[in-house]
From Swiss-Prot:
UniProt name for this protein: Uncharacterized protein MJ1223
Higher taxonomy: Archaea, Methanobacteriati, Methanobacteriota, Methanomada group, Methanococci
Membrane topology, from the record: Multi-pass membrane protein
Organism in which the protein naturally occurs: Methanocaldococcus jannaschii (strain ATCC 43067 / DSM 2661 / JAL-1 / JCM 10045 / NBRC 100440) (Methanococcus jannaschii)
Family as reported in the entry's similarity comment: To M.thermoautotrophicum MTH1250.
A cellular-component GO term for this protein: plasma membrane
Compartment(s) where it occurs, according to its Swiss-Prot or TrEMBL record: Cell membrane
Keyword terms: Cell membrane, Membrane, Transmembrane, Transmembrane helix
Transmembrane domains' residue ranges: 1-21, 30-50, 62-82
Length: 92
């Protein structure tokens, strides 16, 4: 992997992580879930990029586990915090 491509990927992932953190600390459940999803994707992608640089064989499995746990955690959070759906307006 070219050093400039690697540095660009690291810098882009760093900015994405900062955006995800900023979004996570805003009010509202939706903002927190989107921010958490961004951080999960950034962490998994960062692990894959670093594994390409340093030739780590097990990093792809760890990144896949992070992606899956992030999605499952977001759905579990929605289910627990979601509340009662009977009070929601139903479309006609």
């Amino acid at each position: 992997m070219n050093i400039y491509v690697w540095l660009f990927a690291i810098i882009a992932l760093s900015f994405s992580a900062l955006v995800g953190l900023r979004l996570s600390f805003k009010k509202g459940t939706a903002n927190v879930l989107v921010g958490e999803s961004i951080i999960t994707v950034v962490a998994g992608t960062l692990i894959v990029v670093i594994s390409q640089k340093y030739n780590l064989a097990f990093a792809d499995t760890i990144a896949l586990a992070i992606f899956i746990c992030g999605v499952v955690g977001a759905f579990a959070f929605c289910k627990v915090i979601g509340g009662d759906n009977e009070k929601a307006k139903q479309p006609n």
